[in-house]
Structure formats: structure tokens, C-alpha cells
Amino acid sequence: MTNLEVMGKAARQAAFELSQLSAGDKNYALQMIAEQLESQQQQILAANARDIDEARINGLNDAIIDRLLLTPERLRGIANDVRHVISLADPVGKLIDGGILDSGLKLERIRVPVGVIGTIYEARPNVTIDVASLCLKTGNAVILRGGKETRHSNRILVEVVQNALEKAGLPKTAVQAITDPDRALVMELLKLDRYVDMIIPRGGAGLHALCKQHATIPVIIGGIGVCHTFVEQSADQNRAISVIKNAKTQRPSTCNTLETLLIQESIAHEFLPKLAAELPVKYYADKTAYSILHHAGAEVLAVTEDDLRKEWLCTNLNVVIVQDIEAAVAHIREYGSQHSEAILTESLQLARRFVAQVDSAAVYVNASTRFTDGGQFGLGAEVAVSTQKLHARGPMGLEALTTYKWVATGDYTVRS
């Protein structure tokens, strides 16, 4: 039987111990984790294969199975992400700002760990290691609750991490997992505010809504990517197509994948047939785009209101024709999830206008939305992509897992 009260208390104590460690101590533990991931590859992949088999038996779709899948290459990538975290500067103890006050007090604002973090995620076994490594680097303890789809993978990954922690002389309770699939435990975790300081969900809209509705702990909302790219009439069309192909097809199951393509009306008849020839996906198009794409021989269906709000997580692509940049921004404001949006244009003035008017965590000029990623941003393995404005926004790396404290030093100073 899982006792979250016991887990929370142990995590709180582990967080205190982690907060006192040097960067070298934490990096040594991370090195042990990376080595254990590689030395235990066979066992990890065998456990993951069980999850994949069960997912197929249960009829899960290809997008979920892709997120669930671990391969030797992906596992090596996860281990290398841990090593990259080692190479990053430790933000804990960093001076943010400070100065001498009129009272004579020396006032400093320094970065400190958040404390205990709860992470709830679905078919993403890589999150187990990503979150554990970032939390350890920043001196935070973590309680993980993965989806039932990943139970075999998560169990062995947490064992690997805990064994590495013990080898490094650190409390294994710094990284704990809820392995019981009982959903009541999720609700209990969301209300464990006596011990847990922050909840980070990683999954679909339903999971985020559940956490937001029931948590008595601050929740980081994000990761739902209804991402747009607007092709403005001055764009280099051939180069624009290469960006669109990358944004849509490189890895369709990710949250930074392009879901809706906005085309300026003045170039639609010229551009869309070129796109259809280069990008053979299933299109969901508005009336005018449907006619053009159908005539070009593309596989196309009529787009619906629900489609425009959908995170496809596959190669389906919405196409909407807009009159100008004003209409493009209005569409994004109505249907976007404040994740990642892009404009393809040769106009610096319009690019600046797009950046100023689009209120998303990441806004791109002449680049793919696929770059919204902690590794690509140089942050290391991300814990999440936040689409809210507090406490963090965009890919959440190390600094997003810290808070700060004010430290005032005086000479027996009293307030007058």
C-alpha cells in the first residue's frame, strides 16, 4: 500500500539534505545515473518492451506508443542529456542582485531550491530521468507519478536512479515514484501541500485540467501545443516549405509540432500546390484551401472548429487562408495554446509586429517551432514547457526549478 504521507515526509527530509550539497556532490550523483542507464540498458529496454506490448494490446494509438517507446538510441540520448545537465552551471546559491541599503544593510537575492516537486505524467518514460536529473541538480526532491502505460519502464528507471543515489552517498528518497495505478493517489498527491511545493503535469489537456482543478499546490500548466506557422506573402516559398516540413514531420507526436498552417491569401494559389507536392500529409483545410489542395491531388478534408483547437500529435495538418498579418494574429489569439508560433517572412517590420502581438511562450521568425525544447535552448533536459506566465514560461530548465530568498547582513542593525 502506497503511503503518500510517508513519502512526502521522506522527500522533505531528502530535499533539506540536497539543499546543503555542493555542485560537485550533485554532479557525481548525476554521473552515476548516466553510467547506470547505459550499464542497465538491456533490463531497461526489456521492461519498456513489456509496456509497448501492453500498449498495443490495449489499442493505444501510434502517437502515444511513440512517446512511450525507448530504443538504444533514445536511451543513449537520455544518458547524454544527464551528462549535459552535469556540464551546466549550478544555479543554487547564485546571486541574482543586491546592494547596500540606506540603513546600512547588505541585501542580496540568491537562488535556492524549490523543495519538493511532484510530477504527474503519462506515456513518457524519458520524463522520469529528465525530471530526476534536473531536480537533483537544483537540490530538489521529487515524487514521480507516471502513467499506467509506463509502469514497467518507470519502475526500473527509478530503481536505476535510486541505486545511483546510494552509490553516491545520497538519500534514495530524493527520487521516489508512485507505482500503484490507483487514480485516487493522484488526487492525494495534488493535495499533499504539507510536503510538496510545486506540481508539474506532463500530458494532455485532460491531465492539466485535472491538476488545475483539484490541486492545493501551485501547478505549472503547459505542454499542450496547438502551434501555428504564418506564411506571409513576402516569404521565400521554397525555404518556407522546408521549415514547414520540419515543423510538421520531424517528430509529429511532440508538443512543439506545427498543427495549423496560416497562408496569406495573396499567395495561396501559388504556394499550396507546391506545398502539397512536397508534403504528402492529410490536410484539414478551410473552404478555399480545400479547393486548391483537392485540385493539386492532396488528401484533404474540411476543417472543423474542433480541429482548429486540436493537438493532432500526428501528421495531420490544418490549413487556413488569412487575408493579412492582422487576421493571422487574430486566429492565433483565438485558437492557440500560447506554446509556440512562427512567421515566415522577408519583412523585418512585419516580423517585429508578429513578435510584439503574439502572446506565446516562444515566438519564431523564419524558424521551425520544433526548437521549443530545453536541450535546443541550451537549458539541458527540460522538466516541462510552461504556457503560463507564473512561475516560469517556455522550456523549464534549471533556473525554473529554483526560487529565491532575501539575505540581509547587518552590523547588529536595527530599524529606526
Curated annotation (Swiss-Prot):
InterPro entries for the chain: Ald_DH/histidinol_DH, Ald_DH_C, Ald_DH_N, Aldehyde_DH_dom, G-glutamylP_reductase_CS, Glu-5-SA_DH, GPR_dom
Main location: cytoplasm
CDD domains, alphabetized: ALDH_F18-19_ProA-GPR
Pathway: Amino-acid biosynthesis; L-proline biosynthesis; L-glutamate 5-semialdehyde from L-glutamate: step 2/2
This protein's record includes keyword Acyltransferase: no
A GO-annotated cellular component: cytoplasm
Enzyme class: oxidoreductase
Record-level GO BP terms: L-proline biosynthetic process
Compartment(s) where it occurs, according to its Swiss-Prot or TrEMBL record: Cytoplasm
Function: Catalyzes the NADPH-dependent reduction of L-glutamate 5-phosphate into L-glutamate 5-semialdehyde and phosphate. The product spontaneously undergoes cyclization to form 1-pyrroline-5-carboxylate.
Protein name: Gamma-glutamyl phosphate reductase
Source species of the chain: Actinobacillus succinogenes (strain ATCC 55618 / DSM 22257 / CCUG 43843 / 130Z)
Gene name as annotated: proA
